[in-house]
From Swiss-Prot:
Gene3D superfamilies: Putative methyltransferase TM0872, insert domain, Vaccinia Virus protein VP39. It comes from Nocardia farcinica (strain IFM 10152). NCBIfam families: 16S rRNA (cytosine(1402)-N(4))-methyltransferase RsmH (TIGR00006). PANTHER family: 12S RRNA N4-METHYLCYTIDINE METHYLTRANSFERASE, S-ADENOSYL-METHYLTRANSFERASE MRAW. Its EC number is 2.1.1.199. This is Ribosomal RNA small subunit methyltransferase H. The lineage of its organism: Bacteria, Bacillati, Actinomycetota, Actinomycetes, Mycobacteriales.
């Protein structure tokens, strides 16, 4: 699929709301916008067009996404720096753009999870609706695949991954069946795994909670790509990069991600004065203030136009004090 085809199918999620939240930090001359999950560049193109003085630092671990985004953003070539890295590489990416890792950024967007392009390309193995190689790597140039996890992990490690990252009730039962089947034939395709899940998860449980493969595929994807560990490292680095008045928007698509984001923002919006002191110490107040009340969701109209917006949870914050 070429850039035009991808662009026609990719609709940026919560674009107008992201602009409302980030826009006040992007109007000043020389503002720096970091898109930590560049994807096909839909959000970035919007901001570069709307804010003519804006400078973009775009990150993505997917080399094909970077290539396509580079083509899409070619009209803004003098204002962009694109870096092949995970979002926890934000400090190094800023360095490549000639910027310090702290206090140099006006706005940051993190649109987490698997991209539309990755879901649409069957050979990437992210979708359980088509039979494809069990890959699931966001960076197809490195790392283990989902097949490697299924074919080499111990029963205990498999059950841990399925339970912790997929919140799968039948993690132990599924792990046992994986071990049994791989002794006869290693797993190669998503269809083999989907068939196992239909056979292993009780019929009553399959009737609720969506597709029976949803939780297992999520767990494998998170494990293969180190998504939660990367997010835990990325959020502090992203928040540190923001100048006073700088803003961040994070969009999560599953509860595990949103929980990490919620906890980090809660910590950064709390007073830094020791709890046993009766008054707030100068310079020890909260570094950030929340811009959203809880996690915001897409409206019915947007979900109807773009079904992939249905699970999104958006949180945002603004730096109000310099880092101590």
């Amino acid at each position: 699929m070429n850039r035009e085809q991808h662009g026609a199918r990719h609709v940026p999620v919560l674009l107008e709301r992201a602009d409302e939240l980030l826009g006040p930090a992007l109007t000043e001359p020389g503002a720096v916008y970091v898109d930590a999950t560049l994807g096909l560049g839909g959000h970035a193109e919007h901001f570069l067009t709307r804010y003519p003085g804006l400078r973009l630092v775009g990150l993505d671990r997917d080399t094909e996404a970077l290539r396509l985004a580079g083509e899409r953003l070619a009209p803004f070539a003098e204002r962009i720096t694109l870096v092949h890295t995970r979002y926890d590489g934000i400090a190094d990416a800023l360095g490549q753009a000639g910027l310090p890792p702290t206090g140099s950024v006006s706005a940051i967007l993190m649109d987490l999870g698997v991209s539309s392009m990755q879901l649409d390309e069957a050979e990437r193995g992210f979708a359980y609706s088509v039979d494809a190689p069990l890959d699931m790597r966001m960076d197809p140039t490195s790392g283990i695949t989902a097949a490697d996890v299924l074919n080499t992990y111990s029963h205990g490690d498999l059950a841990r991954v399925l339970k912790n990252y997929g919140e799968e009730r039948f993690a132990g039962k599924i792990a046992s069946e994986v071990i049994r089947r791989r002794a006869h034939k290693p797993f190669e395709t998503s269809g083999e795994l989907v068939e196992l899940l239909y056979a292993t998860i009780p019929a009553a449980a399959r009737r609720t909670g969506g597709h029976p493969a949803k939780r297992t595929f999520q767990a494998l994807r998170v494990e293969v790509n180190g998504e939660l560990d990367s997010l835990r490292a990325a959020l502090p680095a992203a928040l540190d990069a923001l100048r006073v008045g700088g803003r961040i928007v994070v969009m999560s698509y599953q509860s595990l991600e949103d929980r990490v984001v919620k906890q980090e923002l809660a910590a950064r919006t709390s007073s830094r004065t020791p709890v046993d002191l009766p008054v707030e110490l100068p310079g020890m107040g909260p570094e950030f203030r929340l811009l959203t009340r809880g996690a915001e969701k897409a409206g019915e109209r947007e979900i109807a136009e773009n079904p992939r917006a249905a699970p999104v949870r958006m949180r945002a914050a603004e730096r109000i004090e310099a880092a101590s």
